[in-house]
């Protein structure tokens, strides 16, 4: 059995790591490179960096900090933010990123997934999906440009349909960002993640809602995800990564220490 992964997420805005609640009211939590180095030293399996306003502001993630991170850490990391061409993806990979993630650009141009997969192979192509539960229609819908509250907009896609579409086009991994749960630390959306797991044949990363070690155990055992992503519990020191991994191991979840 493959070991499950613990993935700290670093949202980047204006060169700093920030964190919001339900994609709003972001506050600065630290500097990019020191935080990345800290998490690598604390036994994180992988890191994800999101330049959260890049797509909404029509720019691309800054390569300067990508190269600095690559020099400082020895674990895989993924970068996202405004990447919408083969050339931009190649640059980020050349500067040291192991994977690139696309979200809003893929919604604007789904064929981008095919082109990236053809060029680089699916193993380094991650699709981020910002999924919002609409209580009025009891459905999960995909939103776009979520890094800027003023720019956020609805799309034509229901989450299940978009999950199937991005797999058909060749993504290698999916990060499901559950917007309603983001930053509130009340637990992952097990129902939605299990629903997506049933139609997802590539590795699935859960994002949004982690508040306790028990929440991580629940998402691995009840939703069957391959990795759990979290931000505020790690940034604020609420959960220590190595202790979390030992807890999960003690409860039957395969982990690398």
Curated annotation (Swiss-Prot):
The active site is at residues 11, 130. Pathway: Amino-acid biosynthesis; L-histidine biosynthesis; L-histidine from 5-phospho-alpha-D-ribose 1-diphosphate: step 5/9. It comes from the Bacteria. It catalyses: 5-[(5-phospho-1-deoxy-D-ribulos-1-ylimino)methylamino]-1-(5-phospho-beta-D-ribosyl)imidazole-4-carboxamide + L-glutamine = D-erythro-1-(imidazol-4-yl)glycerol 3-phosphate + 5-amino-1-(5-phospho-beta-D-ribosyl)imidazole-4-carboxamide + L-glutamate + H(+). Its main location: cytoplasm. Pfam families: His_biosynth. It is found in: Cytoplasm. Keywords: Amino-acid biosynthesis, Cytoplasm, Histidine biosynthesis, Lyase. SUPFAM superfamilies: Ribulose-phoshate binding barrel (SSF51366). InterPro entries: Aldolase_TIM, His_biosynth, HisF, IGPS_HisA/HisF, RibuloseP-bd_barrel. One of its GO terms (cellular component) is cytoplasm. GO terms for biological process: L-histidine biosynthetic process. Its EC number is 4.3.2.10. One of its GO terms (molecular function) is imidazoleglycerol-phosphate synthase activity. It is an enzyme of class 4 (lyase). Heterodimer of HisH and HisF. PANTHER family: IMIDAZOLE GLYCEROL PHOSPHATE SYNTHASE HISHF, IMIDAZOLE GLYCEROL PHOSPHATE SYNTHASE SUBUNIT HISF/H IGP SYNTHASE SUBUNIT HISF/H. IGPS catalyzes the conversion of PRFAR and glutamine to IGP, AICAR and glutamate. The HisF subunit catalyzes the cyclization activity that produces IGP and AICAR from PRFAR using the ammonia provided by the HisH subunit. NCBIfam families: hisF (TIGR00735). Belongs to the HisA/HisF family. This is Imidazole glycerol phosphate synthase subunit HisF.
């Amino acid at each position: 059995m493959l070991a499950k992964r613990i993935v700290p997420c670093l949202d980047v805005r204006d060169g700093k790591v920030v964190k919001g609640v339900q994609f709003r009211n972001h506050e600065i939590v630290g500097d990019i490179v020191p935080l990345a180095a800290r998490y690598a030293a604390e036994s994180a399996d992988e890191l994800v960096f999101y330049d959260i306003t890049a797509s909404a502001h029509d720019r691309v993630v800054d390569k300067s900090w990508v190269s600095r991170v690559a020099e400082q850490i020895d674990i895989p990391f993924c970068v996202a933010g405004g990447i919408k061409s083969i050339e931009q993806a190649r640059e980020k990979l050349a500067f040291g990123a192991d994977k690139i993630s696309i979200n809003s650009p893929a919604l604007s141009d789904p064929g981008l997934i095919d082109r990236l997969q053809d060029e680089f192979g699916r193993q380094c192509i991650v699709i981020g999906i910002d999924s919002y539960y609409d209580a009025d229609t009891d459905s999960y819908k995909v939103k776009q440009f979520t890094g800027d509250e003023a720019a956020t907009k609805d799309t034509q896609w229901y989450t299940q349909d978009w999950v199937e579409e991005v797999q058909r086009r060749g993504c290698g991994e999916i990060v499901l960002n559950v917007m309603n749960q983001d930053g509130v630390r009340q637990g992952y959306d097990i129902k939605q993640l299990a629903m997506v797991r049933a139609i997802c044949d590539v590795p699935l990363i859960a994002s949004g809602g982690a508040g306790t070690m028990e929440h991580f155990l629940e998402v691995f055992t009840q939703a069957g995800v391959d990795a759990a992503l979290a931000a505020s519990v790690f940034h604020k020191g609420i959960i220590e990564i190595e202790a979390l991994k030992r807890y999960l191991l003690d409860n039957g979840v395969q982990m690398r220490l």
